[in-house]
Amino acid sequence: MEEMKKNGVWIPESSQKPVKTEWNAGSVIFTYFEGDINSMVDEHFSRALRNLKRPHKCSSSSHSDNLTLKNGVNKTRTDTSHTDRERKVESSQTENSGELKDVPVEEKGTNKSMPPNQRHLSSWTIAQPAASPENGARSSSLDEYGLKAMDQHSLSMPKTPSALPLEPWHFSSLARPGFIAPAYFPVFPDRHLTPEVYRVFPDRHLTPEVYHVFPDRHLTPEVYPDGRCGPLQHLVQQDRYQNHPLEPAARENCSPAKIAGSTGSLMNLPPYPVHYKKKICARGAASASLDDERSPSPKRRRDAYYY
């Protein structure tokens, strides 16, 4: 009421007390009031709110101070109790064999002072444990199998474009410069090579790989008067006379028995037997003269192509 007097508002004594008042939570609510109530209500509520906030702030600050003091005093106690709990848990886990997975086991060869990422990297460099005898035998058998597979693969690969090879070539072309490559002499199991193949390379020397096809050939080089041996070109020169017609005397000497004994059975002959027989007979007819072979006799030509 003193504040109302200071504001200069005069109120009679009969109307100074409110008609009805309600007391609730330390605050007074005026239900009926005469005069300017707006300023009074605002001032009343502002004062009531200030009184409510102050004890809450004081209590919260005192509570936080107590917490900080308690934490400062009991800090060491909580740390020691926490470490003791961890040790107890680890000891209980190690006692139980079923709970060993929960205990972190340090890897062998790792340093405790190393960070976790370096420990992970160093674990890759640890030497592997020694393998058991069974594992060693398995690994050795696998290695041997791999080597055998490599060897078989290298042997199965065709080194030459020749079709149907009978046997591998045992002679290397690098060791001998005059060696003819195996691709020039393909071997067929059902027939013998005709001498036309060797006529392509007159300057090359015949090698032992060629004569396993012709068993009647002899690897005897020419012997010169001074004693030195010459190349095997005289055999190639004998084959050059096969392109010319034969004499009747030479054809008589070429009997079927001699042909079968020197060059194999006649069942393996190609579909053109006349030409092939003429080539075989030419091997034994090395003494025929060129003048008689070149004579234009129709009878001789007929006999040369028909037996």
From Swiss-Prot:
Residues 297-307 have a biased composition (Basic residues). Residues 58-75, 111-121 have a biased composition (Polar residues). Keywords: Nucleus, Transcription, Transcription regulation. Residues 55-121, 287-307 are annotated as: Disordered. It holds the Pfam family Vg_Tdu. Its main location: nucleus. PANTHER family: TRANSCRIPTION COFACTOR VESTIGIAL-LIKE PROTEIN, TRANSCRIPTION COFACTOR VESTIGIAL-LIKE PROTEIN 1. This is Transcription cofactor vestigial-like protein 1. It comes from Mus musculus (Mouse). The gene is Vgll1.
